[in-house]
Amino acid sequence: MALPNQQTVDYPSFKLVIVGDGGTGKTTFVKRHLTGEFEKKYEPTIGVEVHPLDFFTNCGKIRFYCWDTAGQEKFGGLRDGYYIHGQCAIIMFDVTARLTYKNVPTWHRDLCRVCENIPIVLCGNKVDVKNRQVKAKQVTFHRKKNLQYYEISAKSNYNFEKPFLYLARKLAGDANLHFVESPALAPPEVQIDIALQQRHENEILEAANQPLPDDDDDAFE
């Protein structure tokens, strides 16, 4: 969904809402996509920046109109106007800040209240930072709600495309859809320890085979 003053395109486009606590890296994540950053539009009535992010797939070009809150969530909840007509979503938390993960269920509830049945990706950001507070095996909310989960690092571009590819496949109803060209991304600002991150990714896979805990995602040791 484009804004009233924004050009529409003749290829599939979708409104993608990105939510999560302030400071989790939502804006940093969206700004990695250089053409989207260059063409963004500010909508003052809702207080949102909309970044048009184009991706090239084997079925043609698609666009996500990424709605970024511009930090309003720090002043209370987001207005329904932010969510209305949302066709897909990313919920982001910061793996170095436990509270941002504990608040994920609230963001999910707000999202589903307005948008109901849309594909949602949960993203744990800042996996490049060493002092991780939310361990990979502690992330279970996505399993309870049947969401996709990815560990990402916006500043290093690690896994940048994965949330978009998952959403594109769901929206197109085509599990074989794939990107044929990478978008132009800002150069990495940090490096990620790939070996360490691979261990975390393995933990996620192992945890997926374990029974779900009975807690409400807030029992951190």
UniProtKB/Swiss-Prot annotation:
Cellular-component GO terms for this entry: cytoplasm; nucleus
Top-rank lineage group of the source organism: Eukaryota
Nucleotide-binding listed as a keyword: yes
Domain Small GTPase Ran-type: 10-174
Short name of one Pfam family: Ras
A GO MF label: GTP binding
Subunit details: Found in a nuclear export complex with RanGTP, exportin and pre-miRNA.
Protein name per UniProt: GTP-binding nuclear protein Ran/TC4
Organism of origin: Vicia faba (Broad bean)
